[in-house]
Amino acid sequence: MRKIGIIGGTFDPPHYGHLLIANEVYHALNLEEVWFLPNQIPPHKQGRNITSVESRLQMLELATEAEEHFSICLEELSRKGPSYTYDTMLQLTKKYPDVQFHFIIGGDMVEYLPKWYNIEALLDLVTFVGVARPGYKLRTPYPITTVEIPEFAVSSSLLRERYKEKKTCKYLLPEKVQVYIERNGLYES
């Protein structure tokens, strides 16, 4: 059975924290690949102004292009409305019955697991992999695999704020993503 990691998110913008998490889990669990799963509309972010799907996808392609073990999965972008992990993973497990999926989540999402849509059924479809993030403990009543990673306190919301404040984001996200953001005037106030 193939072992594939999945890291979901808005990737608004993608940054070195996403890449670090994906790479550390890839090596720690001896995965074949890690698929980045950009969300259409994450249920926990409804109502927030999110950058266009086209721009987020382009930035994600630029961020992941150098790693042959990283791929982009468009499953959630093909649907309209909120993206529920259960619905997506049900589709993916039917499409790829020979794959054992490892769904990678940060410490903030580990604590939020009890609120996930159809969590009990989702546990039959994936193995959750929790990675530590500063300020969060990996506490949950659900079974998760834990992977220790070096702390790198960067987030997409921090980067959007830094761009609005016209602060440098160098060394926080891939240079090609930074160039794309600046050329397209993303995250300006």
Curated annotation (Swiss-Prot):
This is Probable nicotinate-nucleotide adenylyltransferase. Catalyzes the reversible adenylation of nicotinate mononucleotide (NaMN) to nicotinic acid adenine dinucleotide (NaAD). Disulfide bonds: none annotated. Belongs to the NadD family. It is an enzyme of class 2 (transferase). GO terms for molecular function: ATP binding; nicotinate-nucleotide adenylyltransferase activity. InterPro entries: Cyt_trans-like, NadD/NMNAT, Rossmann-like_a/b/a_fold. It comes from the Bacteria. The lineage of its organism: Bacteria, Bacillati, Bacillota, Bacilli, Bacillales. Keywords: ATP-binding, NAD, Nucleotide-binding, Nucleotidyltransferase, Pyridine nucleotide biosynthesis, Transferase.
